[in-house]
From Swiss-Prot:
It holds the Pfam family zf-Tim10_DDP. The lineage of its organism: Eukaryota, Metazoa, Chordata, Craniata, Vertebrata. It is found in: Mitochondrion inner membrane. The modification Phosphoserine is found at S7. The modification N6-succinyllysine is found at K53. InterPro entries: Tim10-like, Tim10-like_dom_sf. Keywords: Acetylation, Chaperone, Disulfide bond, Membrane, Metal-binding, Mitochondrion, Mitochondrion inner membrane, Phosphoprotein, Protein transport, Translocation, Transport, Zinc. The gene is Timm13. It comes from Mus musculus (Mouse). GO terms for biological process: protein insertion into mitochondrial inner membrane. This is Mitochondrial import inner membrane translocase subunit Tim13. Mitochondrial intermembrane chaperone that participates in the import and insertion of some multi-pass transmembrane proteins into the mitochondrial inner membrane. Also required for the transfer of beta-barrel precursors from the TOM complex to the sorting and assembly machinery (SAM complex) of the outer membrane. Acts as a chaperone-like protein that protects the hydrophobic precursors from aggregation and guide them through the mitochondrial intermembrane space. Disulfide bonds join C46-C69, C50-C65.
Length: 95
């Protein structure tokens, strides 16, 4: 019975795991999880803001509201992300 572990971690076949490959895969998994969380939060917030009465389809004003809400959310997220990364770089430079 195969658990599925090991084969995804860049093993060389000799039972040795490459720490660099494992670290890279973990980084990718974290990035995917972060993107999924961002999308879920954006969807939840924009749905609550824009959809008054859920139905079978979105009317024109709901579509526009969703599009604008998502654009603003992503712009805000990008602004915060850039500021955060800039601060991290400054703090690393001061160490």
């Amino acid at each position: 019975m195969d658990s599925g572990f090991g084969s995804d971690f860049g093993g060389t076949g000799g039972g040795k795991l490459d720490p660099g490959a494992i670290m890279e895969q973990v980084k990718v998994q974290i990035a995917v999880a972060n993107a999924q969380e961002l999308l879920q939060r954006m969807t939840d917030k924009c749905f609550r803001k824009c959809i008054g009465k859920p139905g079978g389809s979105l009317d024109n004003s709901e579509q526009k509201c969703i599009a604008m809400c998502m654009d603003r959310y992503m712009d805000a997220w990008n602004t915060v992300s850039r500021a955060y990364n800039s601060r991290l770089q400054r703090e690393r430079a001061n160490m």
